[in-house]
Amino acid sequence: MSLVSYPRSESESDIEEETPLASKSFDPTLFQHARRKLSVDSTKKSPKRLKRQVDLQKSSFNDKTFNESDVISNERFKSNDLLELLPAPKNQAELAPKSSKRSDLDLNENYLLPNNSVSDLTSTGSSETVKKSTYSEKSGNVSLFNIVGSESKQASLVDSDQKPYQPILIKPKARANPPKLRNQPENDFISIANHSVHSNAEDINIINEDYIEIGRHRKEKGRIIDVDINKLPKPTQEALPSAPTIKSVAPGRHQLSSLVEMAISQKDNFEAYFEQQRSNKKASSQKYGF
């Protein structure tokens, strides 16, 4: 297989397609699923369709010097359009452009092509360029985001006979039967009896001694008790013997001699502390049974 591809002429490719295979010693049933060989006539259109297109081009050109051979030769080398490849619309519906949501443009008028554009369409062979040109000519000075309108639209909106704006205010409606106000006389009031703590106590039949304990009796004096602070009973925690204080050893390295001296100096405190712990243990065992 060569890596270099040489260009071939159109005559050579046609000859190669039409020449039959040299060897016919193979079984034809083995190649049932092979690709079908394209013939030259398969790209041609039907005569009825070709004749119809020639008539359309004749009516569009309106020229006496019209050669059918040029149209036929162009149709042979022309590729299939997208509309020819797609299936026909359902119920023969017309494929019209969708209506635009914009209020400042009228696309239906822009899509209508003039009579002169038919000849341009057949000569160029593309309808999109004609639509774009007519759309740009008819649209004029149109803003992209509809912020500033065209001059013609602004002139049409302004009317000389237009009346000035008068705001309409919604007024509350008057009631058919308004509520009547009653005039209250000056002497029309309810007398309230004077209630006090003493009157309430008499109603409940509370003794004066109980009343003094419940609340203050303004007419009678309360009981005054002289208390000596120094003779007050001490709490139970203070009555218990206090535990001897033992100095703790400071953190860090220490010599053995310094630790022994500290323990000897606090010998009495250690003995008192151990004795207190034993007595607490005996008292708790007698009280709680363990």
From Swiss-Prot:
UniProt keyword Transmembrane helix present: no
Alphabetical keyword list: mRNA processing, mRNA splicing, Nucleus
InterPro entries, sorted: PRCC (IPR018800)
GO biological process, one term: mRNA cis splicing, via spliceosome
Region Disordered, annotated ranges: 1-61, 114-134
Localization: Nucleus
Quaternary structure annotation from Swiss-Prot or TrEMBL: Belongs to the 40S cdc5-associated complex (or cwf complex), a spliceosome sub-complex reminiscent of a late-stage spliceosome composed of the U2, U5 and U6 snRNAs and at least brr2, cdc5, cwf2/prp3, cwf3/syf1, cwf4/syf3, cwf5/ecm2, spp42/cwf6, cwf7/spf27, cwf8, cwf9, cwf10, cwf11, cwf12, prp45/cwf13, cwf14, cwf15, cwf16, cwf17, cwf18, cwf19, cwf20, cwf21, cwf22, cwf23, cwf24, cwf25, cwf26, cyp7/cwf27, cwf28, cwf29/ist3, lea1, msl1, prp5/cwf1, prp10, prp12/sap130, prp17, prp22, sap61, sap62, sap114, sap145, slu7, smb1, smd1, smd3, smf1, smg1 and syf2.
Reported function: Involved in mRNA splicing where it associates with cdc5 and the other cwf proteins as part of the spliceosome.
Protein name: Pre-mRNA-splicing factor cwf20
Species annotation: Schizosaccharomyces pombe (strain 972 / ATCC 24843)
Species lineage: Eukaryota, Fungi, Dikarya, Ascomycota, Taphrinomycotina
